[in-house]
Amino acid sequence: MIELNNHSKINKNENNTNTRNNSSNNNNNNNNINKTNTNKYFEYNQNSIIYSSIPNSFLSHHPNSVGSQCLSLNSFLPPKPPILLSIFNSDTIGNNNNNNYSSSSSRNNSSGCSSSNNNNNNNNNNNNNNNNNNNNNNNNCNIEQYKNNQKQPKQQQQQKDQTIATQHRISLSSSSSSSSLSSSSSSSSVKQSFQIVKRLFGSLSEYMFPQKDEILYETDPYYLYQDDTQSNDSNEFYDDTDIGSDIDEANLNNTYNIQNCNKTLYNKQQQQAHFVNMNKNVNSNNGTGNSNQSNNVNKNQQNNNNNNNNNSHNNNNGNQNSSSSSSNSGASGSGGNGNNNNNNNNNNNNNNNNNNNSNSNSNNNSKSNNNNKKEGKDGATMNGSHPLIPFRKKPAQVPSPCFRMNSPNSDNDQYLDQLALENSSKKSLVVYNTDNLDQWKHSHLNENFDILQNDLIDIQQQQQQQQQQDNTLQYSSPINKRQEQEQQHIPFQFTTEQQQQLQQQQQQQQQNKTKQHPILLQRQQQQKQKQQQQQQIQQEQIGNNNSNNNNNINNNNNINNNYNNVNDLMNKFEIDQKQHDSQQNLVEEKRTPSFHEHNIIFNSFNFICSIVLDGSNIKSTEKYKAKLIIGFCFTILSFIPSWIIFFWLSGINKPAVMAIIAMPMSISSLVILKRTGSIHYPCHILCFTLCFALTINSYYTGGHQSTIRLLMSTVPIISALVLGRKASIQWSLMVLSIYLLFFVANLYGHEYVQGIPSIIIRSHMNFIIDVTIIIMTLIFTLCYQYFIDEAHRETKLKNAQLTIAKDAAIEAYQARQEFLATMSHEIRTPLNGLIGMATLLRDSHNLPPEEKTMAKAVKSCGDILLRLVNDILDLSKLEANQMGLEHIPFRMRELTQQICHVLSGQANEKNIHLSCEVSDKIPSILLGDSGRILQILMNLTGNALKFTQSGYVKIIIDLIEEESELVSLKKGEYNISFRVKDTGIGVPVESHQKIFEAFVQADPSDSRKYGGSGLGLYLCAKLVRLMKGEIGVYNNPDCDGSTFWFILPLEEGTDQSMQQMNNGARHKAFPQDCVKVLIAEDNIINQRVAVKFLEKIGIKAEVAGNGNEVLEILERQHYDLIFMDFQMPILDGLRCSKTIREFEQNHKWNRICPSIFICGLTANTMSTDKKRCFDHGMNHFISKPFQLEQLRSAIEMAIEHKQRNLMNLNIRN
């Protein structure tokens, strides 16, 4: 649908029309049309109707366009097929110049116009009507001939068409000669001007409108007419209030005649065209329709030129109307003007009567005369022929190939599908013309439509053939077999025959591919790729299942393998995780690929990241920021080419050169990032490049008015994300200073270089800047989302690795604890017998002196071995932060004497002088853990004796009166300095720090020469730091050797506390009947040692080999104290203790007696073992190898426990 002029709706109120006419008449004659009107088109773009406007300023290029808009109609139209060109005949353009094409014509010609002007208009109308009469006569003759041709056979049809064409040419020449009103020179000039305008508009139309976007006319198959009866007010559809819905109906009826005439041209090009007889009952309401072929276009153009020339002469004589004629609506006129309009109507009626006489149908003639009379009463000027008038109509919501006609009768039902549409006032029909739809497809949609249809048919046939071949195969489909075997977890294998058959099928499919259309080939390739991916997934699943079965067997065999290193566990975790991901997540990932897969932006970004980051010295913590820099550079490099092209085409060279310079600057930042590994320099270079380039471009595009400067807001964002808060503040101040310079320059009247015209800046630049900002933001957002996804993936992987490592560490710790507990128990058990028997031999009175010395040597060796075991246990406690410290009084001199007594034998063997020096300033009694201090001094003195071949080893203990910076003191504490000085081999200076690490020695060869495990100094350092002290070593300045020192803060003790310890430590014998003791021990040697130790203090004990024997003995007799071993056969000590407590609570022994005191006597010395002891109902705990004093203290505790229980029983009774 096309609207030639943007007519403003004329309301029924006459005041509005008068004011509009007055405003239009005040304009100039030559410019009133061009300034007020715009031409609107309905463009058809595939499935939608789009409005587009063309200013009437293009009309001003034509020299004869003043007052004549109808002349430029054909020049504005793009080349159309014959069915569209036939619309614009001489009747359409000539007769309607006074009816519907005037944009500023008034309803009353008397407003602001003289009577002379109206007379001129009447003359023009008469001339136009005469021309239309000639055309209608010729066209009606052609229609009758066309109807006769339809009844003849198809073989003679081509000859008839040629005769019809010759007749049309004769009619064109006759009508053009009769309708010409001007001289031959004027007509030739008009033709030349028409061709010039047509060429100008051809170039403009190709630039502004695509060739595919066609203008829909009423004959196009995809235009939907809305029913006029939707609204009784015709002003909604027409600009002229006097033209009602009848004009619409007449125009629609005329379209069918036009189609029938135009089909003759399509028959010449296509032999299989269908014909529709739509001539009957077409002119039932508004008279016979006019039909012109495409060959009449030249005649129409001549008639239009003549009419336009006449109209232009009228305008030059003083007519102020914007169009070539007035609307001639006499119903609303008054005075002389109204008389002139009535004359025009009479002339029109006469012309219509002449046209009706030329028609063959008398009934139609009577109907047309009646309709013309009604129109004359209403004041509308219509020709009897009712040509097709382009009018402004509301577009349809859903385009569909349909036409409307009022007559319900139709002869050719095989070509028409009638759909009744009921409206408020009358009924109308929608007729679908399938023939015209096919023609329109060939001419408008796609030239290769038939080729595609044939290709589709070939594809369907090929698919049917393949299905038949598949059905004839004797074996079942390999894919079905694969699915069945996958369900049974059996690997699938093709046979040789099946492989050959599959290869043959693939070759046939490849041959068929070459015959198919490329679009269809792409679809088939995509489907095959999907099938191949699914097959690969299935094969991988089968392979993974087989590998998992093998791995499970290997894992079952290697369950008991222990990992001594965390790296081994991490490697195992990575392998297991890859296998797990391939089993569970591989199918989902391939069926639903990630957003970043098959994405050009992300693939190119990953490629750049791999080039820059691989082999660089960038820290792992700064790789995320390095990726941000790469993302910004990638965004800049992707948009610089478009900016260069834009500025270069606009004629601005300097901004284009700056954009070119920005590319190597961005690339240089990436090179610096790769070589230096620092993120600071590349980020500053990138920010400087952006600021400099955007400042220059802003200067050449308007300065403070330029929208390019808005892009500088990205500079602080880049610096904030990469360099932090300080850098972002600095670059923010830089950007603000640039904005301020532009503003100040504008205040002082500085004229910026306006490289681009202001129109382009206002229209194109803003649009380009907005699109650039949006796309840059989008790319940065996508890159940032990629960073987040990568960070989440890495975090998830690290969390999983940490979880596995944590579990592995816990398992390793538990395994180590179990190992230590087991080894401690297994070592301490024989040590208990060894040290115990050596102690008994040493204390015996009947043993000779030599044998006593031998017993002492065995006892010392056992003590050394016990000390080594204790060191290992202490190490595990220190690493687990489970080491506890005692706070008991001790004498420092006694402690040093004990050390000298123990190590004197080793010193005498090497002829080394061992001495101890204790300062008198040290208090006699101190509070602290004497056992740990003794252990430290023993280790340091033993190392000095071991690495000294001759000379001396001296222990020096002194008080530091001044406050030491190494150790902080509290009130009542003293800094005690301990030094062990020797004349041995010494310690290198570079080894002073690492010598206190675990399993480290100053020289690795020392372990072979002197022995040792490397744990002594490490334990000493741990114990000193645990007691809030410091330890170190230095070489002797006056002699060979070195000095090990440590400082401890110790409190001063009292004499009362020391007396209590001495009283408790006295060796005294207990009465025989004071306590009854039972020893539960499965080792015979330990049984004898325990019995002999108890006999020394006057206690007789009985022995049980396991927990069941203990319960049997307790059923017969009550005992006050039980020394219970943990690990015993049949029933261990823990369960036996718990059973005893249950019996006591339930009174199963049927006697009233105090509860039994149970003392754990075991080689399990771990902290967890002690806790388990108390949880199972034991009262005390002694570790093996035990001493006599430990047994004495346990007996004393048992006596006190017995006394308390007896008192409680007496109170109850």
Curated annotation (Swiss-Prot):
Transmembrane segments: 600-618, 628-648, 652-672, 676-696, 729-749, 768-788
EC numbers on record: 2.7.13.3
Keyword Transmembrane tagged: yes
Biased composition (Low complexity): 98-162, 171-189, 279-331, 339-371, 498-511, 522-565
GO biological process per UniProt: adenylate cyclase-activating G protein-coupled cAMP receptor signaling pathway; culmination involved in sorocarp development
UniProt-listed InterPro entries: CheY-like_superfamily, HATPase_C_sf, His_kinase_dom, HisK_dim/P_dom, HisK_dim/P_sf, Sig_transdc_His_kin-like_C, Sig_transdc_resp-reg_receiver
Stretch list, region Disordered: 1-37, 98-189, 279-392, 495-565
Pfam families assigned to the protein according to its UniProt record, in alphabetical order: HATPase_c (PF02518), HisKA (PF00512), Response_reg (PF00072)
Domain Histidine kinase: 822-1052
Location of 4-aspartylphosphate modifications: 1125
The keyword Lipid metabolism appears for this protein: no
Source domain of life: Eukaryota
Name listed for the protein in its UniProt record: Hybrid signal transduction histidine kinase K
Organism: Dictyostelium discoideum (Social amoeba)
Lineage: Eukaryota, Amoebozoa, Evosea, Eumycetozoa, Dictyostelia
